Amino acid sequence: MTYLQRVTNCVLQTDDKVLLLQKPRRGWWVAPGGKMESGESVRDSVIREYREETGIYIINPQLKGVFTFIIKDGDHIVSEWMMFTFVADSYTGQNVSESEEGKLQWHDVNDIQNLPMAPGDGHILDFMMKGQGLLHGTFTYTPEFELLSYRLDPQHIK
């Protein structure tokens, strides 16, 4: 049986800019965030992780995506992750240019799809910036992070 890892992240968008983090290992751009601590709520986790990685305190983050990531080697499930993605449009503080996790940079919303990132992340970021409601998704990758399959289920909240 594999252990389910829980992570949170946040897409901070102000005007037409989004703050992203470039991970050093593959050079991929991601929404800042990280692993939840034992007993921590998803909201507390995203606020803490965002501050740790960026120096910024996000104000009133809203949950907009719940995702399952399955890493498979053949028919064997190597690991499973649950990711809770939030959006925010206001914050206090100023971002650092670099943290232990990588380099931080504001990007124009229209340039996001041209950045190097995990194959499924473009779909997630696009919905976070432009979609309405809550997005559920499942992504299956190889251990080398080749995307095997994905499914997205937007849920429009009335």
Swiss-Prot record:
Its cofactor is Mg(2+). GO terms for molecular function: hydrolase activity; metal ion binding. Residues 3-130 form the Nudix hydrolase domain. Pfam families: NUDIX (PF00293). PROSITE patterns: NUDIX (PS51462). It comes from the Bacteria. Its EC number is 3.6.-.-. Keywords: Hydrolase, Magnesium, Metal-binding. A motif (Nudix box) lies at residues 34-55. Disruption phenotype: Cells lacking this gene have an unchanged spontaneous mutation frequency, even in triple mutT/yjhB/yvcI disruptions. Mg(2+) binds at residues 49, 53. It is an enzyme of class 3 (hydrolase). Belongs to the Nudix hydrolase family. This is Uncharacterized Nudix hydrolase YvcI. It comes from Bacillus subtilis (strain 168). The gene is yvcI.
